[in-house]
């Protein structure tokens, strides 16, 4: 929200925030309900078919949370998990639910939850064997819940960008122009550093 606010100020526009779930945010842009979507969105081929993306403003890291003492000790061990928890619509969900021949684990081995917190709760209650989620929320969940740990190996590294309706080049160009200035003067880095790892 703070990056969006900084962009709006650069463009002389008023920011109206409509807080919604991840999938809903993507749909809202496609249907014209929202001008742009910012929710830790990463660019992938499926999303590029239905929306356009700004230049990247940060790099995110997906990690794996397990219970201490779990038989899952490395990312490779995820292949042996009976069930993996993720947040619906996120990159972790997309990667994990992809067919095995596409390096995923298949939809039968993945449960998508409405939030990362619900996925972690499912892990605590032994409904899933592991949770794949962004690094920063993962650290907060592990800190708040005794008996959880993050695997040493990263699951995936990805670029975050802002989604706009396909073909809205005027808005996209304006956002990219503002982002360029905000990255150059350090504004984006100082905001992003509070929330996600941006290397």
Placement of each model-derived feature along the sequence:
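Alpha-to-beta junction loops
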Residues: 12-14, 30-39, 82-83, 115, ...
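Ligand-binding clefts/hinges and TM-proximal coupling segments of bilobed small-molecule sensing domains
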Residues: 91-110, 146-151, 180-199
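A ligand-binding cleft/hinge motif common to bilobed small-molecule-binding domains
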Residues: 24, 41-49, 95-98, 122-125, ...
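Flexible hinge/capping segments at coil-to-helix
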Residues: 66-83
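Extracytoplasmic small-molecule ligand-binding "clamshell" domains
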Residues: 1-40
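Periplasmic-binding protein-like
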Residues: 59-66, 135, 139-180, 196-199
């Amino acid at each position: 929200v703070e990056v969006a606010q900084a962009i709006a100020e650069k463009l002389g526009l008023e920011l109206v925030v409509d807080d919604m779930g991840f999938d809903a945010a993507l749909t809202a842009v496609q249907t014209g309900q929202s001008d742009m979507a910012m929710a830790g969105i990463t660019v992938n081929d499926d999303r590029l078919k239905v929306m356009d993306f700004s230049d990247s403003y940060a790099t995110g890291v997906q990690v794996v949370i397990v219970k201490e003492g779990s038989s899952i000790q490395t990312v490779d061990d995820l292949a042996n998990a009976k069930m993996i928890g993720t947040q619906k619509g996120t990159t972790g969900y997309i990667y994990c639910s992809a067919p095995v021949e596409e390096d995923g684990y298949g939809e039968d081995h993945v449960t998508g939850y409405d939030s990362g917190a619900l996925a972690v709760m499912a892990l605590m209650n032994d409904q899933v064997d592991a949770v794949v989620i962004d690094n920063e929320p993962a650290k907060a969940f592990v800190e708040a819940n005794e008996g959880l740990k993050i695997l040493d190996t990263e699951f995936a590294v990805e670029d975050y960008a802002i989604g706009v309706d396909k073909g809205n080049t005027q808005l996209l160009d304006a956002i990219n122009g503002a982002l360029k200035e905000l990255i150059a003067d350090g504004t984006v880095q100082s905001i992003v550093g509070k929330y996600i790892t941006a290397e």
